[in-house]
């Protein structure tokens, strides 16, 4: 197409949504003119399934659960008065607790005020809060957030070192729906030890966000933690950012959670519209279907031209890949669905992988995210009549054009500014687009059996480790190769796992395992040196 034809296509396929301060440009996707007409029956079916989900139908059939994250920003939509009341009560409790923390009515044992918080969670229990904190935080935050989002000891040491002597002014929030997530449990125990090492009582500075009567809930109640906030079984981790999971840390940080909820609520209203061409989430889902052939044939690259949206691609990576990446469809037929998602930020990526996007394998489509407002206040001119923000906008348009010249397709989302409201809009937009796409390809977006499989496999490894260490201790001073140990404990098929266990144990002082050099790496002998 020439420039005039592209302009006409842009006019035809630019969606403008003033209610949410957003535009959606599909003009650089090469779908045929009859694409929407062909997909309309499937899209209307997806819209009806979404409406049934919001009415309280069992949308997660595998776990026989309702799916209710949309109720969080409009409790009146909840299917029962009890659920509606619980949502409202929890929001009020978050605000009251936050006010008490900020005012000093609830203070650390040393009598000062809380200046930092340590959020312990993994997956959706960390990615959502991290994204919001990074996107909306400032040097004027009322409380500075830190995160344990893994079970990496060195990573936790680094976070604790950064908190340093301020641990006495640090509120810890432990987030786990089940209350039994090992990574989160480990982080909690590491944090508890750090408090105790400084003569502090962990329970006096701890808050739980968890399911009612979970292991974590019972622990927090028994130990007298400062507060407990609910995670309901109808909220999944990756869609929990507008629940206490995301709202409590954001409120404590000093962010406008009402604005966040309002943006999500308004976007929910716009994305309930039954006319496909007026529904941005429906259009996004249809573009994903077109680009990937409905079977994940292309990757999704997220390119926000805003530093504050750096973590958005990581947040979307979980939201989309954990929701869409499924082995079976809702009929039990093997489908192996999924869309790979990755990204960073522009214009940084122009000096990284955009080279391949333009000239390498064409196995992707890009979503550009443009923010019109550069900053609060005026900018200096870095060239005559040109600001740094003008350069950023120019690089965005240049990259979009350079990719299209090579037949690389893209979607562009434009928002007026970055604010709590627009972050709420973006979160809600993608939540609903994921739900629509899942309906289009007939999968359950709201469970994650693959994650559970990994957890079970890890449990098996740790069980083998226990047997290996027990045998080495029993035969103290005697060396064994991995194969010899596998035979000794009756686990001949686990020699590789045992070898890796031994390498890790020998590299750390915790289990008193020592490695002797062998003729080859597999002839190494390991023994208990305690």
From Swiss-Prot:
Function: Catalyzes the reversible isomerization of glucose-6-phosphate to fructose-6-phosphate.
Gene: pgi
Name of the featured protein: Glucose-6-phosphate isomerase
Record has Isomerase as a keyword: yes
Cited PROSITE patterns: P_GLUCOSE_ISOMERASE_2, P_GLUCOSE_ISOMERASE_3
Compartment list: Cytoplasm
Active-site feature positions: 322, 351, 455
Keywords: Cytoplasm, Gluconeogenesis, Glycolysis, Isomerase
Organism, as annotated: Geotalea daltonii (strain DSM 22248 / JCM 15807 / FRC-32) (Geobacter daltonii)
InterPro entries per UniProt: G6P_Isomerase (IPR001672), Phosphoglucose_isomerase_CS (IPR018189), SIS_dom_sf (IPR046348), SIS_PGI_1 (IPR035476), SIS_PGI_2 (IPR035482)
């Amino acid at each position: 197409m020439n420039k005039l034809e592209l302009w006409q296509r842009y006019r035809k396929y630019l969606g403008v949504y003033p209610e949410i301060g957003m535009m959606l440009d599909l003009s650089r996707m090469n779908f045929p003119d009859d694409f929407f007409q062909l997909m309309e029956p499937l899209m209307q079916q997806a819209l009806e399934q979404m409406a049934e989900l919001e009415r309280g139908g069992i949308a997660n059939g595998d776990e026989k659960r309702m799916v209710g994250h949309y109720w969080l920003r409009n409790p009146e939509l909840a299917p029962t008065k009890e659920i509606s009341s619980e949502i409202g009560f929890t929001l009020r409790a978050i605000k009251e607790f936050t006010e008490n923390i900020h005012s000093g009515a609830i203070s650390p044992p040393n009598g000062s005020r809380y200046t930092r918080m340590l959020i312990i969670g993994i997956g959706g229990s960390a990615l959502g809060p991290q994204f919001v904190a990074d996107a909306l935080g400032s040097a004027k935050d009322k409380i500075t957030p830190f995160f344990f989002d893994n079970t990496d000891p060195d990573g936790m040491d680094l976070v604790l070192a950064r908190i340093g002597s301020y641990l006495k002014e640090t509120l810890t929030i432990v987030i786990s729906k089940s209350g039994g997530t090992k990574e989160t449990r480990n982080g909690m125990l590491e944090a508890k030890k750090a408090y105790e090492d400084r003569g502090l009582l962990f329970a006096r500075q701890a808050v739980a966000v968890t399911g009612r009567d979970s292991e974590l809930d019972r622990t927090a109640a028994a130990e007298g933690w400062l507060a407990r906030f609910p995670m309901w079984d109808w909220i999944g981790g990756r869609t929990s950012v507008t629940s206490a999971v995301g709202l409590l840390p954001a409120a404590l940080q000093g962010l406008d959670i009402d604005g966040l909820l309002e943006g999500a609520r308004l976007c929910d209203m716009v994305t309930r519209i039954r006319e496909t061409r007026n529904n941005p989430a429906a259009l996004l889902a249809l573009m994903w279907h077109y680009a990937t052939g409905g079977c994940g044939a292309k990757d999704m690259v997220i390119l926000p031209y805003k530093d504050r949206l750096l973590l958005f691609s990581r947040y979307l990576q979980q939201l989309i890949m954990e929701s869409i990446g499924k082995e079976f469809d809702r009929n039990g037929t093997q489908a192996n669905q999924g869309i790979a998602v990755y990204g960073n930020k522009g214009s940084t990526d122009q000096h990284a992988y955009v080279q391949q996007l333009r000239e390498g394998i064409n196995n992707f489509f890009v979503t550009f995210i443009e923010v019109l407002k550069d900053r609060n206040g005026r900018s200096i001119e870095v060239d005559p009549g040109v600001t740094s923000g003008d350069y950023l906008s120019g690089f965005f348009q240049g990259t979009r054009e350079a990719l299209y010249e090579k037949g690389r397709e893209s979607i562009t989302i434009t928002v007026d500014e970055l604010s709590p409201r627009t972050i709420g809009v973006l979160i809600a937009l993608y939540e609903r687009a994921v739900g629509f796409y899942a309906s289009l390809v007939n999968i359950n977006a709201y469970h994650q059996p693959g994650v559970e499989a990994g957890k079970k496999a890890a449990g098996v490894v740790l069980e083998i480790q226990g047997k290996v260490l027990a045998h080495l201790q029993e035969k103290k001073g005697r060396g064994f190769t991995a194969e010899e140990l596998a035979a000794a404990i009756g686990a001949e098929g686990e020699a590789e796992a045992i070898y890796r266990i031994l390498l890790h144990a020998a590299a750390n002082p915790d289990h008193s395992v020592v490695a002797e050099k062998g003729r080859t790496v597999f002839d190494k002998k390991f023994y208990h040196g305690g």
